[in-house]
């Protein structure tokens, strides 16, 4: 993952509106997973790359805070008053301290764990703290993680049996194709996690 924050300038009017929304805010900053074609990139949202691609990025991490009115993504203008390292450190600390509700998945014979329906369920994959918990729950050295859409995450042991693997991939594909809940898409890939960290991704 690239730790460099990127962002394009917005119009002065847009910048002033966003800065006003977040000025003196005590709202917490969180990382948010987005696909590489996310419109926020053109609008100037700060981001770092999770999965690079030839023409930019396949998956990026945006950074934002929950204001009283809506969720506001940080832009390049925020770097005038906030340090980029401060932003990323605070975002990932807040994620680590967030209760994402990891629990066993009955539909996969309790041989999987998931976090679904919470604001930062999919972002749980970015937290070593939460991934180590998943390792322990599944008693697995290597994990396969599915985060096809926001608020959705399912995890199995990479060494699970064939039946569970097939169900897991089916569930991933079904969720990726299903837009009925309007959950924003992230990526049609599976992630391999070792020792709580992403080490590889498998495009499907």
What are these regions (language model features)?
Residues 60-64, 114-116, 146, 156, ...:
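Residues in well-ordered beta-strands of folded domains
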Residues 63-65, 123-125, 142, 179-182:
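Aromatic-residue detector
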Residues 116-169:
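Intrinsically disordered, low-complexity segments enriched in Gly and acidic/Ser/Thr residues
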Residues 91, 95, 99, 133-138, ...:
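Hydrophobic, Leu/Ile/Phe/Ala-enriched alpha-helical segments that form helix-helix packing faces
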């Amino acid at each position: 993952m690239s730790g460099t924050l990127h962002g394009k300038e917005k119009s002065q009017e847009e910048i002033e509106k966003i800065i006003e929304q977040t000025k003196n805010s005590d709202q917490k900053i969180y990382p948010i997973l987005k696909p590489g074609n996310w419109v926020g990139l053109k609008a100037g949202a700060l981001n770092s790359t999770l999965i690079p691609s030839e023409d930019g990025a396949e998956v990026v991490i945006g950074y934002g805070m929950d204001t009283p009115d809506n969720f506001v993504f940080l832009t390049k203008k925020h770097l005038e008053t906030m340090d980029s390292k401060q932003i990323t450190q605070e975002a990932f600390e807040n994620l680590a301290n967030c209760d994402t509700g990891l629990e066993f998945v009955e539909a996969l014979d309790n041989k999987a764990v998931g976090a679904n329906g919470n604001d930062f369920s999919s972002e749980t994959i970015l937290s070593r703290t939460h991934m180590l918990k998943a390792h322990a729950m599944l008693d697995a050295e290597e994990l396969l993680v599915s985060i096809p859409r926001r608020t959705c995450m399912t995890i199995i042991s990479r060494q699970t049996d064939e039946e569970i693997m097939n169900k897991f991939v089916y569930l991933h594909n079904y969720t990726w194709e299903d837009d009925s809940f309007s959950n924003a898409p992230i990526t049609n890939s599976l992630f391999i996690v070792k020792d709580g960290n992403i080490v590889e991704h498998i495009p499907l």
